[in-house]
Design a protein with these regions (language model features):
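Coil-to-beta-strand transition motifs
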Residues: 209, 223-225
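Blade-edge beta-strand/turn elements of extracellular beta-propeller
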Residues: 83-86, 183, 225-227
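Short, cationic motifs built from Arg/Lys/His that form the positively charged side of catalytic pockets
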Residues: 82, 103-104, 215-217, 225
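Acidic/glycine-rich beta-solenoid
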Residues: 1-151, 168, 187-197
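A motif-centric feature for acidic-aromatic and gly/ser/thr-rich catalytic loops and repeats
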Residues: 131, 143-216
Length: 227
């Protein structure tokens, strides 16, 4: 199987992806990317980090347990098959905590420092401090004195967030997407402002994880597959 994606800057076209996929029993076993790596700031392309006959490993339920291309040595799940821990080759970890219904309560990123995100209803806390309140059509952020600032989404027909503007109408973020949900690097603006992106889902860019959280499953837009 082959996937080719052509991309464009203001001055020229270039080959973003040319992936050769080895698929067995409807599971991707390995990917070889024939396109060169991109150097554009914030570029979103498949990183071909391995050259093995088997680069993706799965458990009996079909859930991904190891990804050699992303440098992930182990992926663990809880008894309800919720993603619970990702361990990278460098020892960094990302952990998730859920309630009994499977809703995400907490994300923990363990790297050179440890950062936490807590989800309490529509409120989000970063490292124990109130960060934002999410509402339909946008969110409210808070400074250190809990003074609010309102931000509003401009969405496309898929519900993907194309633009974020503040309460004064100032553009704060611009997002453009490839067909499978990858984010343009050079044509976007301030992509780290907030994490909700393609079809409104939260995008986790930490440690090169680069997955969209759809609740029941994670989506990898770089290879267009559910994991």
């Amino acid at each position: 199987c082959c996937i080719a994606v052509q991309a464009q800057t203001s001055s020229k076209n270039y080959l973003l992806e040319k992936q050769m996929l080895d698929v067995s029993d409807n599971q991707i076993q390995s990917i070889s990317d024939k396109a060169g790596s991109l150097l554009y700031d914030g570029s979103f392309d498949f990183k071909d980090g391995a050259s093995e006959s088997t680069e993706y490993f799965y458990n009996a339920n079909g859930a991904l347990t190891k990804d050699l291309n992303k440098g992930i040595s182990k992926i663990e799940y809880d008894v309800l098959d919720n993603l619970s821990c990702i361990t990278f080759n460098n020892g960094f970890k990302t952990k998730y905590v859920y309630d009994a219904g499977g809703s995400k309560l907490k994300t923990i990123h363990e790297a050179l420092t440890t950062n936490t995100t807590d989800y309490i209803g529509d409120f989000i806390f970063e490292d124990g401090k109130l960060s934002k309140y999410q509402f339909e059509g946008g969110y409210c952020s808070f400074d250190s004195h809990l003074n609010p600032t309102y931000h509003y989404y401009e969405k496309d027909h898929l519900g993907s967030i194309r633009m974020v503007v503040n309460e004064n109408g100032t553009i704060e973020q611009v997002n453009h997407y490839y067909p499978f949900g990858g984010v343009y690097g050079d044509l976007g603006y301030n992509s780290e402002l907030q994490r909700n992106k393609y079809i409104g889902k939260e995008f986790d860019h930490t440690s090169g994880w680069d997955w969209y959280d759809h609740g029941a499953r994670m989506y990898d837009a770089a290879k267009g597959s559910w994991d």
